């Protein structure tokens, strides 16, 4: 995790308590804790400390949010503890891909904890696991679909 993705956790916890939302940020707490001050200064953002995690997530774990079941897929590379959350719903397949995948690209690996080889393995894993009709919601900017990325993203051409 990076400061720009965990900054809202404290506010959410103040409203809803230790909910599933906090679990999304808890996979690898060493990177944000070690670098959060550096990230705040580099990006010029103020983010409250997210506090202690309520649960650490691992590959295959599930999170229930209402009647939706989110499956945890470990996707290190942008950060060591990166995850994607996938749900197959009546309305269609959806994946919260964070900064692992972007339209035509992938997340940065030049920041602290980034690993180019790991993110390439993560993209290959997503290409095999996620159905083509999956809508991918990114951590920044536009959404995409697995079908589009499999056709157009040079980092998914394996």
Segments (PLM) and residue ranges:
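Active-site HxH/HxHxD metal-binding segment of metal-dependent hydrolases
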Residues: 1-63, 151-155
């Amino acid at each position: 995790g990076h400061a720009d993705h965990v900054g809202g956790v404290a506010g959410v916890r103040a409203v809803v308590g230790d909910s599933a939302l906090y679990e999304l940020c808890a996979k690898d707490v060493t990177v944000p804790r070690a670098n959060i001050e550096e990230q705040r200064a580099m990006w010029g953002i103020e983010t409250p400390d997210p506090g202690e995690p309520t649960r650490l997530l691992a590959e295959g774990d599930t999170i229930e949010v209402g009647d939706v079941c989110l499956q945890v897929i470990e996707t290190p590379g942008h950060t060591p503890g990166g995850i994607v959350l996938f749900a197959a719903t009546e309305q269609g397949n959806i994946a919260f891909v964070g900064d692992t995948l972007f339209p035509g690209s992938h997340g940065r690996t030049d920041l602290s904890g980034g690993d180019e080889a790991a993110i390439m393995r993560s993209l290959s894993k997503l290409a095999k696991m996620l159905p083509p009709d999956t809508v991918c919601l990114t951590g920044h900017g536009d959404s995409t679909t697995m079908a589009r990325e499999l056709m157009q993203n040079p980092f998914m051409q394996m």
